[in-house]
C-alpha cells in the first residue's frame, strides 16, 4: 500500500480534507486496499486512522500534533443526523508523575489543541461502518474564552493529580475538559502520585473534550 505524502502547506491539507466531504468510508478504504470492520467495538480508532492516512498525517502514536510541520492536530468526530457529537473527543494521555513545573502553556493538551482540523463523520450505529459519510471539515483555533476554559479545567485536574487525588477525579470534573481511564484493558496499570507523595499504581488516564464543548465548536461553524 502506497503511503500518502504529507501535505506541504495548510491550503493543501484543507484541499485534501474538503475533497473527502460526502465520500463514504468504504470508498476510501477500498481505494487504499483496507478492509472495513463490521463494527467499531474492537476497532475504535479505525475511522481516525483511515482519515489520518488519507490526509498524510505524520505523528502516528507520537505525542505531538498529527501535522507537526503545519501546527495542526487532526480530530475525527462522530456526529448524529443533527450534526451533534456522539461521544467525547480524546486529546492525549495525562501525565500522572513527574509533573513538577508543568504549566498549561507547555502541556501536551495545550500543544495539541492550538489548531485542530475537525473532520465530522456520520456515527449513528444503524449506519453500516462502510456507508458512513465524511462531512465538511473545519479548521479551529481556540478563542481567548475557549482557551481560558481549557486552561482552568486542566489546571484544576493537574492540581488534584499532584495532590494524589487522581482516584477522586471523575468524568464530571471540568467544564469542557475531563479526565478518564485510558486503556482498552482495565488491568493496564501505571504509576501515579499518592496522597503522601509516594508512588502508587493506577489505571492510565486520558484527557477528553466534553461533547457540549465540541458541539459548541461545530455549531459556531455550521450553525
Swiss-Prot record:
GO terms for biological process: DNA modification; mismatch repair. Gene3D superfamilies: DNA mismatch repair MutH/Restriction endonuclease, type II (3.40.600.10). InterPro entries: DNA_mismatch_repair_MutH, DNA_rep_MutH/RE_typeII_Sau3AI, DNA_rep_MutH/T2_RE_sf, Restrct_endonuc-II-like. It is found in: Cytoplasm. Disulfide bonds: none annotated. Pfam families: MutH (PF02976). GO terms for cellular component: cytoplasm. Keywords: Cytoplasm, DNA damage, DNA repair, Endonuclease, Hydrolase, Nuclease. One of its GO terms (molecular function) is DNA binding. Its main location: cytoplasm. The keyword Nuclease applies. It comes from the Bacteria. Belongs to the MutH family. Sequence-specific endonuclease that cleaves unmethylated GATC sequences. It is involved in DNA mismatch repair. HAMAP family: MutH (MF_00759). This is DNA mismatch repair protein MutH. The lineage of its organism: Bacteria, Pseudomonadati, Pseudomonadota, Gammaproteobacteria, Alteromonadales.
Amino acid at each position: 500500500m502506497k503511503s500518502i505524502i504529507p501535505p506541504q502547506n495548510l491550503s493543501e491539507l484543507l484541499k485534501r480534507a474538503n475533497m473527502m466531504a460526502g465520500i463514504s468510508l468504504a470508498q476510501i478504504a477500498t481505494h487504499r486496499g483496507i478492509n472495513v470492520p463490521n463494527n467499531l467495538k474492537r476497532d475504535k480508532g479505525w475511522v481516525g486512522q483511515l482519515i489520518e492516512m488519507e490526509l498524510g498525517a505524520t505523528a502516528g502514536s507520537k505525542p505531538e500534533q498529527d501535522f507537526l510541520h503545519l501546527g495542526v492536530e487532526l480530530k475525527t468526530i462522530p456526529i448524529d443526523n443533527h450534526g451533534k457529537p456522539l461521544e467525547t473527543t480524546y486529546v492525549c494521555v495525562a501525565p500522572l508523575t513527574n509533573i513538577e513545573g508543568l504549566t498549561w502553556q507547555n502541556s501536551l493538551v495545550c500543544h495539541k489543541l492550538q489548531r485542530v482540523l475537525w473532520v465530522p463523520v456520520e456515527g449513528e450505529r444503524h449506519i453500516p461502518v462502510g456507508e458512513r459519510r465524511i462531512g465538511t471539515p473545519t479548521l479551529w483555533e481556540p478563542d481567548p474564552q475557549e482557551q481560558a476554559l481549557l486552561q482552568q479545567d486542566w489546571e484544576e485536574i493537574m492540581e488534584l493529580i499532584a495532590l494524589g487525588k487522581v482516584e477522586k477525579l471523575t468524568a464530571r470534573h471540568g467544564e469542557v475538559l475531563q479526565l478518564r481511564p485510558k486503556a482498552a484493558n482495565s488491568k493496564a496499570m501505571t504509576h501515579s502520585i499518592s496522597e503522601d507523595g509516594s508512588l502508587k499504581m493506577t489505571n492510565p488516564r486520558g484527557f477528553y473534550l466534553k461533547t457540549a464543548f465540541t458541539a459548541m465548536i461545530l455549531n459556531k461553524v455550521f450553525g
